[in-house]
C-alpha cells in the first residue's frame, strides 16, 4: 500500500498485538474509545514496547471539551513524559480556547515537553470556528499531521471540507481522515478528498465481546484484524485512487 497510511486506534493490549502486522502503519494508543479516546494508562504504554516505533499516544486527560486549565496541563505534561519514557514514537495532542480557536500557548508548552517526539493534532480541529486557519497554525508549530473528520461526525459526511483542508495544507502538513473510516468508504474518501492517510478503529461491523453485565462491549481482536485485512485489500485494488 505504497503511498497510503493506515492508522488504527488501539485501547487494549490485545489490539496492540493485532496491530503488530505491517499492514498497520501507525497506532494511535488510547483508552476509552467510547468517549472519543483518552490518554492510555502507563501500563498500556509500556506494553507497546514491541511496536513502539509506530505507536503514538493520545494525550487527552478527560472527556468533554478541549479547553484546559492549569491542572489539566500538568497532567498532560506528565503523560507526555510517560510516553517518552515508554519509548513511543509520538503523541497526539490538542487544546482550544473558549473562543474556539487553537490555544497556541498551551500547544507550544506541550510541544516543548514533547521535544523529539512526532506530534499529531487531534480532532480538536473539528470543534474550531476556522479549521483552515488552524492548519496554518499547526504548520507554524511544527506539527506533523492533523487528524480530522472535516468538521462532521464522520469523515464521509465531512468529505467536501476534508478536500478543502487537503488543498489548504498542500505538502506542508499531512491531513489524516478519521471517524467512521471503513473498507466500504475508503475509495470514495480518497477519490473525493485527495487524502492518503486514514485513521480507523477497525471495530465497525458490530462484532463485539459479550457484555452481560453492562460493563462495556468491545470489538474482538479477530474482528479488528478482519477489518484491517479488508482495508488493506482496498488499498491494493487496481482502481484505488493514486
At which residue positions do the language-model features occur?
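N-terminal pre-domain/capping segments
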Residues: 1-27, 32-39
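Hydrophobic faces of well-ordered beta-strands that scaffold small-molecule active sites
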Residues: 4-10, 27-29, 55-59, 91-93, ...
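Catalytic cores of alpha/beta
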Residues: 11-22, 65-82, 119, 126-141, ...
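Active-site-adjacent beta->alpha loops and helix N-cap segments on the catalytic face
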Residues: 13-15, 33-56, 70-75, 95-115, ...
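A short, flexible beta-alpha/helix-coil linker loop
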Residues: 62-64, 98
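C-terminal alpha-helical cap/extension of soluble enzyme domains
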Residues: 63, 87, 169-242
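Ordered, amphipathic secondary-structure segments that act as subunit-interaction surfaces
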Residues: 78-95
Amino acid at each position: 500500500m505504497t503511498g497510503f497510511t493506515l492508522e488504527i486506534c488501539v485501547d487494549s493490549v490485545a489490539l496492540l498485538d493485532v496491530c503488530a502486522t505491517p499492514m498497520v502503519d501507525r497506532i494511535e494508543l488510547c483508552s476509552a474509545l467510547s468517549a472519543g479516546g483518552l490518554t492510555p494508562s502507563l501500563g498500556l504504554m509500556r506494553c507497546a514496547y514491541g511496536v513502539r516505533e509506530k505507536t503514538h499516544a493520545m494525550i487527552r486527560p478527560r472527556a468533554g471539551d478541549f479547553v484546559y486549565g492549569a491542572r489539566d496541563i500538568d497532567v498532560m505534561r506528565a503523560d507526555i513524559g510517560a510516553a517518552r519514557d515508554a519509548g513511543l514514537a509520538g503523541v497526539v495532542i490538542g487544546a482550544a480556547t473558549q473562543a474556539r480557536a487553537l490555544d497556541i500557548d498551551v500547544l507550544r508548552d506541550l510541544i516543548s515537553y514533547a521535544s523529539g517526539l512526532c506530534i499529531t493534532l487531534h480532532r480538536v480541529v473539528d470543534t474550531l470556528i476556522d479549521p483552515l486557519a488552524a492548519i496554518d497554525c499547526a504548520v507554524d508549530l511544527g506539527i506533523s499531521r492533523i487528524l480530522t473528520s472535516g468538521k462532521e461526525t464522520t469523515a464521509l459526511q465531512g468529505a467536501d471540507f476534508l478536500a478543502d483542508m487537503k488543498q489548504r495544507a498542500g505538502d506542508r502538513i499531512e491531513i489524516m481522515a478519521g471517524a467512521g473510516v471503513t473498507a466500504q468508504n475508503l475509495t470514495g474518501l480518497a477519490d473525493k478528498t485527495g487524502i492518503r492517510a486514514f485513521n480507523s478503529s477497525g471495530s465497525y461491523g458490530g462484532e463485539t465481546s459479550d457484555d452481560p453485565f453492562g460493563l462495556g462491549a468491545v470489538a474482538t481482536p479477530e474482528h479488528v484484524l478482519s477489518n484491517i485485512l479488508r482495508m488493506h485489500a482496498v488499498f491494493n485494488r487496481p482502481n484505488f485512487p493514486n
